[in-house]
A protein has these predicted regions:
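Conserved N-terminal phosphate-binding loop of PLP-dependent enzymes in the Aspartate aminotransferase
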Residues: 2-458
Length: 458
């Protein structure tokens, strides 16, 4: 007979939890001297509820992760069913049925030619794996090309916080302190926004592609891969690339024999209106990096998809030393795979992508009305994401002193109106779960507008 478990101790009150939070938790991307706790206790669809019962629209999809809302019945059931079987098995030389099925389903929905799936734990890890695979691929290609060791990256790119991802990242405030630990990529200006360090406007589509071609020609035989966020650079401040840029990059990288790594950690799984952003321009990369929405925001999991051509370069007897000696303890975790499978089922069975155009148009209509606001310098909108850039003046444009944190103030003010938002500098970002209703979009945009009005007054 099993012993009766002891009763749970009563949960500490909200004030005690907040004190423990300040004392013990080091929050990511947060200046802890200024941190004020907000403790989220539960979620309901597009809403989050704190320990005091206050409700907030999840306007950032819990850091761009949540797809179908919180506590979706099918996802909850899939997680519970898998936990009743096994919660974790290693992916190092072992597998499980759920992870195998998930890999197969990912291949089915991914762009053509991406047939192999390497699982890891988060977006940085997905990019890190792609960089290392691309580097090792050229060493083991037939014939080997040992000189292909360079990577091409884009200005203001963000690919994560592990060292390889930091190296190809271009957001200076995130990466500069770690520069001595990393390698130097070949950096191209972004076609999506004004360079913050030089003030130079984004080059045109033609100029951007011509520059890429000159770089690839000047570095013939030296470039392993180009890595980029397709269509939309999220952490740069919601920078949107001109239509045709991605397709042009694919044509040029293929022409010069350079692998193309697309980082869809943020923009994959319906965010731009198609399942993957690269499908907007019918582009199939050599690597596709996925995380965040991979499990619809339920569990940390990532995947790096690549081609059979790349995979074959790693096959051989053990003594040939062709193995990819890289991996993480929780790569291919069956709990994450189970929820990921259920998420793909929801996309298919609930017509998620088919239902997006009306929501996208509602979001566009709301943010467009802010264009005349005296302190809204620019609005950038694509799919189910919008960036509203604040400025001290519009003509000519004058940025607020960065120390004033106007974007953060706008988001904190929006919180008082029932929405949780997170800015990118002075860009107020709207990035709700795809499941958000039209009425909830109205409420989210009203809260954001109120926050902007309060933060820019006076």
């Amino acid at each position: 007979m099993k012993p009766t478990p002891p009763p749970h101790a009563p949960r500490p009150d909200a004030a005690t939890l907040a004190a423990w939070d300040r004392d013990h938790v080091w929050h990511a991307f947060t200046q802890m001297l200024e941190y004020e706790p907000l403790l989220v206790e539960r979620g309901e669809g597009a809403w989050l509820v704190d320990v005091d019962g206050n409700r907030y629209l999840d306007g950032s999809a819990s850091m761009w992760c949540v797809v179908h809302g919180h506590r979706h019945g099918r996802l909850d059931a899939a997680l519970a069913a898998q936990a009743a079987k096994v919660s974790h098995t290693t992916n190092l030389g072992l597998s499980n049925p759920t992870t195998v099925e998930f890999a197969r389903r990912l291949v089915e929905v991914a762009p053509a030619g991406l047939e192999k799936v390497f699982f890891s734990g988060d977006g940085s890890s997905a990019v890190e794996a792609a960089l290392k695979i691309a580097f090792q691929y050229w060493l083991q290609a037939d014939p080997p090309r040992e000189g292909r060791t360079r990577f091409v990256a884009i200005g203001e790119a963000y690919h994560g916080d592990t060292l390889g991802a930091v190296a190809v990242g271009g957001v200076d405030r995130f990466t500069s302190v770690f520069a001595p630990l990393t390698f130097e990529p070949i950096r191209l200006p972004s076609p999506g926004g004004t360079c913050p360090s030089t003030g130079r406007p984004a080059p045109s589509l033609g100029e951007s592609l011509a520059l890429l071609e000159r770089v690839l020609e000047a570095n013939t035989g030296r470039v392993a891969a180009m890595v980029m966020e397709p269509v939309l650079q999220a952490a740069a401040g919601i920078w949107i690339h001109p239509e045709g840029y991605l397709a042009g990059v694919r044509d040029l990288t293929r022409k010069h024999g350079v692998l193309l790594i697309l980082d869809e950690v943020a923009v994959g799984f319906g965010r731009t209106g198609t399942m993957f952003a690269c499908q907007r321009e019918d582009v199939a990369p050599d690597f596709l990096c996925l995380a965040k929405g991979l499990t619809a925001g339920y569990l940390p999991m990532a995947a790096t998809l690549t081609t059979a051509e790349v995979w074959k370069a790693f096959l051989g007897p053990y003594a040939s030393r062709r193995t990819f000696f890289h991996g993480h303890s929780y790569g291919g975790n069956p709990l994450g795979a189970a929820v990921g499978l259920a998420s793909l089922d929801v996309f298919r069975d609930e017509g998620v992508l088919e239902g997006l155009p009306e929501k996208i148009e509602r979001l566009r209509a709301h943010v467009s009305r802010l264009a005349d606001h005296p302190h809204v310098a620019e609005i950038r909108h694509l799919g189910m994401v919008a960036g509203i850039e604040l400025a001290a003046g519009k003509t000519p444009r004058r940025a607020y002193p960065w120390q004033e944190q106007r974007g953060m103030k706008a988001c904190l003010a929006a919180r008082r109106h029932g929405a949780l938002l997170r800015p990118l500098g002075d860009v107020v970002v709207l990035w709700p779960p795809l499941s958000i209703s039209l009425d909830e979009i109205d409420r989210l945009c009203a809260a954001a507008e109120a926050g902007i009005r309060e933060a820019t007054a006076g």
